[in-house]
C-alpha cells in the first residue's frame, strides 16, 4: 500500500493515487491495538498468526506515553511494520519501540523452515531501542530473506547489534539512524556467517543515506565465515560524537570486514576517528580472507587518524580526501599486506585554508602496475614501501611475470619499441627475459635488494601479437611496473680507451652493432659525445657493415701528441 504514494521527490506532503492523504492511509492500516493480547508482543504475534501484510504502530501517546515493548518476535513472512515517525534523537514522541528485558532480539524476520523464501516486508518510520544501554544481543535479525527494507528508522541504545543479517539478498537499508550502539560484542550492522553454503550469504545489499554516530565496535562489519558479496555502502554519514555506554576495549575500525567481495564504499563522510576517540585506529579494515574487488572511492575522511589496514582482497582506493592541518599531521595512508592486487592511491590532504599538503601521486607516462597485466600464473602481490603503487608481484624462478598485447599501430614493420621494467631481485641469480612467444629477445640480470629500471628494445620484425616477461633465473624477482611504447631514438653508451694519440694518429672504437636492438631502422646518428674534453680531436661516426653497425673514429689533427682522459662515448641513434 505505502508503495503507491504519488509524491514528488523531497516532499513531506503527499497523497495516494486514490486521493487519500498519508495520514488517512496510515489510519487505514491494521492497528497493533486492534489485535488480541495483553502485551504489545502478544498483539503482534496475533497479527502474524492472522497473516496480515501490514501492521501500523501509533505514537507512544496510545501506550500511556511509554515505548511499546517487544521481545523475541519471530516474523516468518514479509510483514511490513509501519510507524508514524518520531521526534528528536532521544525521543519521547512518535512511534518508539523498546526491546523487552531479557529478550535476545526484538524482531527476527526469518524464512528458515519456510517452503519458499520470503520476499519483501520490513520496518518503516519507527524508532527501535534496546532495553538498556549495556544490553547484548540484537535489535533486529534478518535470516534467509530477500527484498527486506528498513527505511526512516532509528536503531539505538544497546551494546549489541542494531541489525544482524544472515543469508539476506536484494535488500535495502536506507535513510536510518544508528546511534548509541555497540561495544566489545556489538556494533551497527553485522553481516553474519553464511547459513549453510557459501552462497547463503548477504548479497546485493544497499546501505545508503544513513547516519551513524556515537557507537563502539564495527559500525558495519562482517564475520570470518560471512562471504558478503555485492554490497553498496554509499552516501552515509559516520561521525564520532561521543562514546556509548560500552566503549571499545581493543583497537577498532569503523568499517571492519573479515570477509567482503564486490563492494562499493563510495561518497561517504567519516569524521573524527582517532585512537584517542574510543580507540578507532582506522576507517577501514579488510581481513586476510577477503577475496573479491572492493572499491573505496570519493570518501571524505575528515579529522581521521588513519585510512586503515588492507590485509586481503583486491582493493582499489582513489579520490579520498582528508583535511588535517599539515602534511605532517595528515592522515596515515593505508597499510597494505594483502597478497592480492591492490591499487591504493594516496588520500589527498587539503588544509582548511585550501592548501593541498598531500597530493596525488604522479606516475610516469604510460606506467602500468605489473599486477594489472594478464598472465598465465597466479602470482602473489605483496606490500613494498618502495613500490610505485605499494603492491608488487613476487615472481618465482622459471615463471612468467606478465604478458601483454602489442597495439596494432606498432605492428607496421617500422616501429621500434622499448620496455622499461622496474624490478629488484630477492637474492642473487634473478634474471628477466623478454620473449615473443617462446623466442627470447633479450635478458637482463637483476640486481639483488635494490630497485632499478631495466630497459629492453624490441625490433620492428620482432613485434608479434603478444610479448611476455619471464623470470628465467634461480631467485625470485620482485616486479613493480613497466612502461611500454614506441621509441624515436636510442642512446648508445659504450666504453672507449683512446689513451695517448700521437700527432696525426687515429683511434677507432670497438664495433657497435645495433642490428639486434633496432634492426635496420636507424635513420641517422648524432655527433658523438664523451665524458671528457676532446680538444684538438676530430670525431665522426662510420658505418661498418650493411647489417647495422658503426664505429666512432677519433683523430689527432694537431702537430703534437694528445693525452685523452675520456672513457665513455654516447651516440644517439634516431629510429623514426
UniProtKB/Swiss-Prot annotation:
Comment text on domains: Consists in a catalytic region, a carbohydrate binding region and a lectin-like region. The active site consists of catalytic dyads Asp-Glu located at the interface between 2 adjacent subunits. The lectin-like region is probably involved in trimerization.
Record text on subunit structure and interactions: Homotrimer. The 3 parallel chains are tightly packed together to form an elongated structure of approximately 7 x 12 nm. Interacts (via N-terminus) with depolymerase 1 (via N-terminus); this interaction probably gives rise to a branched tailspike.
One cellular component term from this protein's GO annotations in UniProt: virus tail
Main location: virion
Gene Ontology BP annotations: adhesion receptor-mediated virion attachment to host cell; symbiont entry into host cell via disruption of host cell envelope; symbiont entry into host cell via disruption of host cell glycocalyx
Residues of the active site: 170, 229, 239, 241
Outcome recorded upon mutating residue 167 to N: 8 times decreased enzymatic activity
Catalytic as annotated region, ranges: 34-360
Matching InterPro entries: Pectin_lyas_fold (IPR012334), Pectin_lyase_fold/virulence (IPR011050)
Family according to the record: In the N-terminal section; belongs to the Przondovirus depolymerase 2 family.
Residues covered by region (Lectin-like): 488-576
Domain of life: Viruses
Protein location: Virion
Start and end residues of each stretch annotated as Carbohydrate binding: 380-487
Biological role: Functions as a receptor binding protein (RBP) and probably mediates the attachment to the host capsular exopolysaccharides. Displays a depolymerase activity that specifically degrades the K21-type polysaccharides Klebsiella pneumoniae capsule, which allows the phage to reach the host cell membrane and bind the entry receptor.
Keywords (A to Z) from UniProt: Degradation of host capsule during virus entry, Degradation of host cell envelope components during virus entry, Host-virus interaction, Viral attachment to host adhesion receptor, Viral attachment to host cell, Viral tail protein, Virion, Virus entry into host cell
Descriptive protein name: Depolymerase 2, capsule K21-specific
Amino acid at each position: 500500500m505505502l508503495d503507491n504514494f504519488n509524491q514528488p521527490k523531497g516532499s513531506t506532503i503527499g497523497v495516494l493515487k486514490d486521493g487519500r492523504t498519508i495520514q488517512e492511509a496510515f489510519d487505514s492500516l491494521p492497528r497493533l491495538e486492534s489485535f488480541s493480547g495483553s502485551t504489545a508482543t502478544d498483539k503482534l504475534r496475533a497479527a502474524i498468526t492472522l497473516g496480515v501484510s501490514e501492521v501500523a504502530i501509533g505514537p507512544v501517546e496510545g501506550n500511556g506515553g511509554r515505548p511499546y515493548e517487544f521481545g523475541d518476535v519471530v516474523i516468518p513472512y514479509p510483514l511490513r511494520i509501519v510507524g508514524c515517525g518520531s521526534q528528536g534523537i532521544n525521543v519521547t514522541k512518535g512511534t518508539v519501540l523498546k526491546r523487552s528485558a531479557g529478550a535476545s532480539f526484538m524482531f527476527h524476520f526469518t524464512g528458515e523452515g519456510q517452503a519458499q523464501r520470503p520476499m519483501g516486508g520490513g520496518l518503516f518510520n519507527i524508532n527501535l531501542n534496546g532495553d538498556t544501554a549495556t544490553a547484548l544481543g540484537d535489535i533486529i535479525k534478518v535470516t534467509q530473506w530477500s527484498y527486506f527494507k528498513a527505511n526512516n528508522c532509528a536503531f539505538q541504545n544497546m551494546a549489541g547489534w542494531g541489525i544482524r543479517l544472515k543469508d539476506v539478498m536484494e535488500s535495502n537499508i536506507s535513510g536510518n539512524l544508528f546511534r548509541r550502539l555497540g561495544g566489545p560484542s556489538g556494533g551497527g550492522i553485522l553481516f553474519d556467517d553464511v547459513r549453510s553454503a557459501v552462497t547463503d550469504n548477504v548479497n546485493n545489499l544497499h546501505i545508503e543515506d544513513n547516519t551513524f554516530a556515537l557507537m563502539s565496535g564495527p559500525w558495519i562489519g562482517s564475520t570470518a565465515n560471512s562471504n558478503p558479496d555485492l554490497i553498496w555502502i554509499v552516501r552515509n554519514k559516520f561521525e564520532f560524537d561521543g562514546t556509548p555506554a560500552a566503549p571499545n576495549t581493543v583497537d577498532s575500525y569503523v568499517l571492519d570486514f573479515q570477509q567482503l567481495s564486490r563492494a562499493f564504499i563510495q561518497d561517504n563522510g567519516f569524521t573524527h576517528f582517532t585512537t584517542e576517540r574510543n580507540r578507532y585506529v582506522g576507517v577501514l579494515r579488510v581481513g586476510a580472507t577477503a577475496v573479491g574487488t572492493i572499491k573505496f572511492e570519493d570518501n571524505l575522511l575528515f579529522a581521521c587518524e588513519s585510512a586503515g589496514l588492507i590485509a586481503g582482497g583486491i582493493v582499489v582506493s582513489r579520490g579520498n580526501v582528508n583535511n588535517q592541518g599539515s602534511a605532517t599531521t595528515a592522515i596515515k595512508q593505508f597499510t597494505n599486506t594483502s597478497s592480492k592486487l591492490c591499487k591504493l592511491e594516496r588520500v589527498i590532504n587539503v588544509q582548511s585554508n585550501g592548501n593541498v599538503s598531500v597530493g596525488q601521486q604522479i606516475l610516469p607516462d604510460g606506467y602500468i602496475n605489473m599486477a594489472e597485466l594478464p598472465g598465465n600464473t597466479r602470482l602473489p602481490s605483496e606490500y613494498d614501501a618502495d613500490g610505485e603503487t605499494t603492491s608488487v608481484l613476487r615472481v618465482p624462478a622459471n615463471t612468467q611475470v606478465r604478458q601483454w598485447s602489442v597495439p596494432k599501430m606498432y605492428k607496421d614493420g617500422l616501429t621500434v619499441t622499448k620496455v622499461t621494467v622496474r624490478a629488484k631481485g630477492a637474492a642473487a641469480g634473478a634474471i628477466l627475459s623478454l620473449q615473443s612467444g617462446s623466442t627470447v629477445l633479450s635478458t637482463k640480470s637483476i640486481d639483488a635488494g635494490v630497485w632499478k629500471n631495466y630497459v629492453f628494445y624490441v625490433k620492428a620484425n620482432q613485434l608479434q601479437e603478444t610479448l611476455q616477461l619471464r623470470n628465467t633465473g634461480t631467485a625470485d624477482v620482485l616486479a613493480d611496473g613497466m612502461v611500454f611504447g614506441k621509441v624515436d631514438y636510442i642512446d648508445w653508451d659504450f666504453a672507449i680507451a683512446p689513451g695517448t694519440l700521437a700527432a696525426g694518429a687515429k683511434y677507432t672504437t670497438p664495433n657497435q652493432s645495433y642490428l639486434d636492438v633496432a634492426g635496420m631502422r636507424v635513420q641517422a646518428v648524432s655527433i658523438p659525445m664523451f665524458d671528457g674534453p676532446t680538444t684538438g680531436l676530430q670525431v665522426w661516426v662510420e658505418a661498418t657493415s650493411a647489417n647495422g653497425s658503426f664505429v666512432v673514429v677519433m683523430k689527432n689533427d694537431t702537430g703534437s701528441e694528445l693525452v685523452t682522459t675520456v672513457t665513455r662515448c654516447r651516440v644517439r641513434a634516431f629510429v623514426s
